[in-house]
């Protein structure tokens, strides 16, 4: 156990008495009620983390604050999350899944509205709309959103697999859009659709990362991502014959 975890668990043990009612209730409850209790505690922890992250940077939040905000003791908190970093995953993971669901549903509706293959620019616009949505999500809380995104690159992060899976999900959707355009003869087929999709995702991650290091205003994130996506996508468009 590293020093950070030791410190977290030391504080948790100091607050063990606060969590006893919750623990006792779960131990004596029927399986169905026990599962309901666990889900309710998880919901309260998630809500507390989301609320606190909306108020201040992740680095300034303590596990004691989260536990108090959720109405539980720290010992109970650490029965649901193994480290402070997992609170970031808990707070952002479901929200990111919901965002991707929303963006995919919007793309499905747009596809149904067209009813047939569109021009090359239409496929490119569909790709851009996904990253415009990601940029809007980032702007809700740039510092904490960037931390969540970086979990995918941290080999020690408990949230790494989920963050990577969400990125892969978006990459696959973009790949399928580009492949549709190629099959329709609207986009150049000699370019590998998966490579382009990975490049598009890399553009977004790079712009998030270099926002603080280059001193860029977070509000310019979509302007920067949009310009680079255009440079990647526009050359693929096959102009229809006159």
Model regions and ranges:
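C-terminal peripheral helix-coil segments that are non-catalytic and often amphipathic
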Residues: 1-29, 136, 140, 172, ...
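Basic, helix-initiating cap at the start of DNA-binding domains
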Residues: 1-56, 60-69, 86
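Amphipathic, non-transmembrane alpha-helical scaffold segments
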Residues: 38, 42, 46, 88, ...
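An amphipathic alpha-helix adjacent to DNA-recognition modules
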Residues: 39-47, 54, 59-60, 71, ...
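Key DNA-contact positions within bacterial/archaeal DNA-binding proteins
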Residues: 75
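Hydrophobic alpha-helical connector segments
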Residues: 90, 104-143, 193, 197-200, ...
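Amphipathic alpha-helical packing segments from all-alpha helical-bundle domains
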Residues: 100-103, 147, 157-184, 194-198, ...
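Amphipathic alpha-helical segments used for helix-helix packing
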Residues: 137-158, 209-213
């Amino acid at each position: 156990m590293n020093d950070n975890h030791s410190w977290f668990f030391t504080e948790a043990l100091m607050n063990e008495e606060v969590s006893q009612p919750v623990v006792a209730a779960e131990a004596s409850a029927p399986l169905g009620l026990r599962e309901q209790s666990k889900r309710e505690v998880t919901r309260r922890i998630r809500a507390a983390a989301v609320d606190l992250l909306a108020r201040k940077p992740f680095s300034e939040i303590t596990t004691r604050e989260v536990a108090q905000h959720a109405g539980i003791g720290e010992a109970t908190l650490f029965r649901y999350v193994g480290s402070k970093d997992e609170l970031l995953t808990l707070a952002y993971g479901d929200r990111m899944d919901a965002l991707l669901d929303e963006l995919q549903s919007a793309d499905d509706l747009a596809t149904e509205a067209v009813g047939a293959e569109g021009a090359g620019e239409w496929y490119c616009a569909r790709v851009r709309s996904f990253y415009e949505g990601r940029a809007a999500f980032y702007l809700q809380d740039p510092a904490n959103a960037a931390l969540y995104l970086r979990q995918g690159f941290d080999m020690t992060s408990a949230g790494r697999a989920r963050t990577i899976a969400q990125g892969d999900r978006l990459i696959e959707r973009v790949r399928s859009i580009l492949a549709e355009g190629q099959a329709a003869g609207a986009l150049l087929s000699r370019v590998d659709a998966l490579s382009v999709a990975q490049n598009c995702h890399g553009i977004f991650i790079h712009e998030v990362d270099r926002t603080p290091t280059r001193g860029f205003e977070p509000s310019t994130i979509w302007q920067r991502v949009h310009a680079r996506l255009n440079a990647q996508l526009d050359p693929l468009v096959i102009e229809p014959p006159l």
